[in-house]
Curated annotation (Swiss-Prot):
Name used for this protein in its record: Olfactory receptor 52B4
Protein family according to the UniProt entry: Belongs to the G-protein coupled receptor 1 family.
InterPro entries: GPCR_Rhodpsn (IPR000276), GPCR_Rhodpsn_7TM (IPR017452), Olfact_rcpt (IPR000725), OR51/52/56-like (IPR050402)
Keywords: Cell membrane, Disulfide bond, G-protein coupled receptor, Glycoprotein, Membrane, Olfaction, Receptor, Sensory transduction, Transducer, Transmembrane, Transmembrane helix
Secretion signal span: none
Cytoplasmic-side segments: 49-56, 123-141, 220-239, 297-314
Protein's job: Odorant receptor.
A GO biological process held by the record: cognition
CDD domains registered for this protein in UniProt: 7tmA_OR52B-like
Transmembrane segments: 28-48, 57-77, 102-122, 142-162, 199-219, 240-260, 276-296
Primary location class: membrane
Species of provenance: Homo sapiens
Gene it is expressed from: OR52B4
Subcellular location: Cell membrane
Length: 314
């Protein structure tokens, strides 16, 4: 039950309100949420299944794509089922520990996806700029080390947030006008000084996501320089088509992420009935569209999907 605490004791249960001002429309709003989530789940699961079962796709590019699809499933599953529970059953009550667990996986998976996109940019750089050395540079041993590094970075940087939140006393309103928990959104309900939470969150953002964006930009500048110096137009076109799908996913992922961050920091005058749905769309859009983009833009995956869905049935 949502309450305002006057005793000074810390709340252990919070209430996720859903979309403030649109509670009477929650059932209708849940329909596109549910369809998008099922699409993301099926699309990414199919992508993972095809990549893992087809030996012709056991290449670094597709293995990194498999990692991205797995992260997409985790990110959407961390948020959308909770939102649907609120929309359908008004099940908005969430314990503090569960709230912290949810935001831990949301933030760490976001950083993990950013790291995977950086690795994919590095993969494209080697494939286009050093094609003859591609297999000797991106060995299976290096790929395993990259996977471990991406995981350690994402979970390692977010892990201290658990203790930064557990130290706080939540003696203010326990009603959260959102469909899921996030770090600063929860911390602002504390009676303590949360400047360390704010600065730590900012430092994580700068040292991971912003750094990844800079390195991705540099890698693609080098790629474009190499592409436009290729001897034949056909080779240039083929190279551009190779990483076109990756560029689309980068724009989709970072564009939606930047919008969400800017809205949280500077969009205080944006009504919650607009901000909350857009925040969910920004989390759900990349997982839903990534398999579609790669299915359309990548010929090898397109062929394997068609073979799996249609030829196998015959």
């Amino acid at each position: 039950m949502p309450t305002v605490n006057h005793s000074g004791t810390s709340h252990t249960v919070f209430h996720l309100l859903g979309i403030p001002g649109l509670q009477d429309q929650h059932m209708w709003i849940s329909i596109p949420f549910f369809i998008s989530y099922v699409t993301a789940l099926l699309g990414n699961s199919l992508l993972i299944f095809i990549i893992l079962t087809k030996r012709s796709l056991h290449e670094p590019m597709y293995l990194f794509l498999c990692m991205l699809a797995g992260a997409d499933i985790v990110l959407s599953t961390c948020t959308i089922p909770q939102a649907l529970a609120i929309f359908w059953f008004r099940a908005g009550d969430i314990s503090l520990d569960r709230c912290i667990t949810q935001l831990f996986f949301i933030h760490s998976t976001f950083i993990s996806e950013s790291g995977i996109l950086l690795v994919m940019a590095f993969d494209h750089y080697i494939a286009i700029c050093y094609p003859l050395r591609y297999t000797t540079i991106l060995t299976n041993a290096l790929i395993k080390k990259i996977c471990v590094t991406v995981s350690l970075r994402s979970y390692g940087t977010i892990f201290p947030i658990i203790f930064l939140l557990k130290r706080l006393t939540f003696c203010q309103n326990n009603i959260i006008p959102h469909t899921f928990c996030e770090h600063i959104g929860l911390a602002k309900y504390a009676c303590n000084d949360i400047r360390i939470n704010i600065w730590y969150g900012f430092s994580i953002l700068m040292s991971t996501v912003v750094l990844d964006v800079v390195l991705i930009f540099i890698s693609y500048m080098l790629i474009l320089h190499a592409v436009f110096h290729m001897p034949s137009p056909d080779a240039c076109h083929k190279a551009l088509n190779t990483f076109g799908s990756h560029v689309c996913i980068i724009i989709l992922f970072y564009g939606s992420g930047i919008f969400t961050i800017l809205t949280q920091r500077f969009g205080r005058h944006i009504p919650p009935c607009i901000h909350i749905p857009l925040a969910n769309v920004c989390i759900l859009a990349p997982p839903m569209l990534n398999p579609i983009i790669y299915g359309i833009k990548t010929k090898q995956i397109q062929e394997q999907v068609v073979q799996f869905l249609f030829i196998k049935q015959k």
